[in-house]
Amino acid sequence: MRRTATLAEAAMWHLLRDRRFSNVKFRRQVPFQNYILDFVCFERRLIIEIDGSQHLDSNRDERRDAVLASDGFQIIRYWNNDVLQRRNVVLEDLFAKLGLDHD
């Protein structure tokens, strides 16, 4: 587990922490089944991963996602650049995927 978050992870955590996102409780950097989850909401079985260029064409990510999906999790991935430069698009996508209304 890393001690410091990437800039994109810190930006996403600012949006999610303290139930700021539609009162949904997220935890960050959570060890689970030999993996470290960037952000997880156990109540909704939802994982959010923030990816950099090291994740391009990553078979390891595909295997990891398959294992977590088989345990009932939905995995949503966003690119670092999108979180940092297109925050509104990321939020709209997240609201839509969760079926949530927002102001």
Regions found by a protein language model. Give the residues of each.
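Basic, amphipathic alpha-helical patches used to engage nucleic acids or provide basic targeting signals
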Residues: 1-6, 28-100
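Solvent-exposed, charged helical/coil patches
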Residues: 1-24, 99-103
